[in-house]
């Protein structure tokens, strides 16, 4: 009976039909650092998505600011600039309550949403730059959203 360490060895079927045991090379320190950087960048991207989806508050009213709200707000803003929206216009807030917004109130809400998006992306870019500049796995893992 053949035995092998399943954690590190793979069986490879060759062209002649024989099966050979193959142990992949041990990752280098550079490989491990690159993997840690990729993992930490993915964590930052996930945190960015969550942070960018938090409601924004305008005049004490919370509004959804997630990806769908961003699309809806952009579309309606473009339509309003083309004269296709009458004001006051209706918009649902984060509590699912209909708000009647003047053109200025609507513009302020859209501006708040995109200010949040800009802030979140700037933070994400800075953190990812720090990850790329880190020289040890410990330094990489110390870079967090909070």
What name fits each language-model region?
Residues 1-146:
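A preference for well-ordered globular domain cores
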């Amino acid at each position: 009976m053949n035995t092998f360490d399943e954690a590190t060895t793979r069986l490879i079927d060759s062209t002649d039909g024989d099966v050979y045991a193959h142990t992949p090379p041990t990752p280098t320190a550079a490989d491990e650092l690159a993997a840690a950087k990729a993992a930490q960048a993915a964590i930052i991207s996930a945190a960015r998505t969550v942070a960018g989806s938090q409601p924004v508050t305008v005049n004490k009213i919370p509004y959804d600011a997630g990806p769908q709200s961003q699309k809806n707000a952009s579309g309606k803003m473009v339509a309003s600039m083309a004269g296709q929206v009458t004001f006051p216009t209706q918009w649902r807030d984060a509590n699912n309550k209909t708000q009647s917004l003047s053109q200025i109130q609507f513009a302020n809400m859209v501006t708040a949403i995109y200010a949040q998006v800009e802030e979140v992306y700037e933070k994400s870019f800075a953190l990812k730059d720090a990850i790329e500049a880190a020289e040890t796995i410990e330094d990489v893992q110390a870079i967090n959203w909070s």
